[in-house]
Each structure stands twice: as C-alpha cells, then as structure tokens.
C-alpha cells in the first residue's frame, strides 16, 4: 500500500469521536483491547495509528498504545527519522519539551516549518486527549522524531521503457509487443508486467 492509500483510510476517520465525550470510549480502543474500555488509562492517539496501519495491511514495529514505545521500536529497526518528515510518516510530539512523548499523528503534508497530520484523540483547543480524529497543523519544532514505514513504491514507467524490459527479460519480439499493446488496456498491462519483471 502507498502513503496516499494509507492517508485515504486515515482521512476517512476524521470526525470520529469518543462517546461519551471525555471517556476514551471509541471504536479504536475496542479494536485494540478486544473489548469496550473507557477511562483515563486508555488514551488512544497511538491506538488510532495502529488501527489505520492494520486496516492498510502495513506492519508496525511494535503493537503498542505508547507513542514512546513505537518510536523506540522504530529506532531499533532503523526506521526512525529526525527531520525531513514526509507524508505517511508517524510523527511523535513532545509539546512541552520535557523529553517525554505526548502525542502522535500521521503526516499528511509538510509546508516549511509546519506539519499537517491526521491525529486520533485530539481536539481544536488542546494538543492531546481531545476525544476525536482531526486534521491538525503543528510546528515541526514539537516533533521529537518519527517512524518512517516501508510503503510500496509507485513507479512511473513509460510504455517504451516497458516494451524494452519485456523484450529483454521475457524474450518477446517486437510483433508480439505490438500485439499486446493493441488490446484495450495493453499499454497499462505492459507497464505492470515490466514493473513486475524489473
């Protein structure tokens, strides 16, 4: 799955709220814990991230409800980054700069010194524990690091490049390639075949 596909899953959740407000009772916690839970012991910003990646079929470095534990696991697997954030990264925030991890989100866009992320358990008047999924824009200086997942790459290839690869690797002649290209989706098929052979 690509970053864009994952972000579509996350953005479809914007507006989901815990019920009742302030309870941490939300579908992501029910999925994660295997039962309905509520109370202050169940903040769910990281649980939301875990849920999104589960739906996308992308493995996380560790199953956890802790932002710090995810960042540490990402570091141990060589998948942590500090700076140069990009869409699809899971950023970890330290809002008060005390060295502890406070919150997380899935980066949707980066613009100069600002990051826009889709976050669980946030709200418009606070940084964390706000009770809903929202798109938030924050200063990059609040980020202590991020997990950079391994996404499937979307490769662009011209039809001519695809033809050459198929001819070289599959041993097909120019006539057969022309025949394939004549079908309704022939050029698209050739590009996909060539990408698989590459």
Q: What does each model-found stretch correspond to?
A:
Residues 46-51, 156-198:
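Short, solvent-exposed alpha-helical surface patches in non-cytosolic proteins
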Residues 1-58, 150:
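N-terminal capping segments
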Residues 1-2, 37-45, 80-83, 99, ...:
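Extracytoplasmic/periplasmic, Sec-exported soluble proteins
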Residues 112-152:
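Active-site signature of cysteine proteases
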Residues 1, 149-160:
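Low-complexity, Pro/Thr/Ser/Gly/Ala-rich linker/spacer regions in secreted
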Residues 56-60, 197-198:
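Short helix-capping/linker segments at secondary-structure and domain boundaries
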Residues 2-4, 58-125:
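...with weaker cross-activation on analogous glycine-rich loops/strands in unrelated enzymes
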Residues 20-35, 129-138, 176-181:
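Short, polar loop/linker segments at the starts of domains and inter-domain junctions
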